[in-house]
């Protein structure tokens, strides 16, 4: 994919026609306290905050209301998700409920096919995305790095896709770099790495490959200092994006001198 593509410029991140000044999205669960979450949001300045409808509807009235107040205080757009859904209809119903509760057409589509790995249901995900798009949703689908799956999601109308780097919460970083780089080369839509990043260097790496944004939760929330880690990731995302725009040198199999040979003795010119 050429550097001349409009997507590869210093312009802000654009998703479904809306622009965002940040290329980092942040999850809202597992933080030590609400105050720590708010401080992490303030430090990271994310484009969006993800929130689970299931988590809030199951929390009870007072706790749920407290969370809504927290989101409002953060003053960051909310991206509701369908976390915990295992069937196509369950995901669609949850998305429709989230639209009413959060008053937004944005939805992070999660359709889980395996409880152990939390791997997406790749067979039903495109159909779920298609139905939601036809219902007026702006769908950001959580998926694997499989090229055929991601292409199918684009074909049904997804204007961005969210492949994982590794299973959710593992913090391993990109486990299949070749597939992820191939995905970037082949798809001309925004790609947001959704899961599996554990270190700021992981985020920097995928941004250097040309990915458009990253979504983080566990890596920040479970850090010893979540606020400092939020800042580290924000800096890493920006550094990786800047490096991609700058155009990195190509790796070589043999050593190349970094100083000129002009003026050195002729017997050294072999």
Regions of interest found by a model, annotated:
Residues 10-15, 29-48, 61-78, 85-270:
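Alpha/beta enzyme core
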Residues 52-54:
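Metallocofactor- and cofactor-centric catalytic cores in central/energy metabolism, strongly enriched
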Residues 17-23:
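Conserved SET/PR-domain catalytic core that frames the SAM/AdoMet-binding pocket
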Residues 2-7:
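Long, charge-rich, low-complexity intrinsically disordered regions
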Residues 26:
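Divalent-cation
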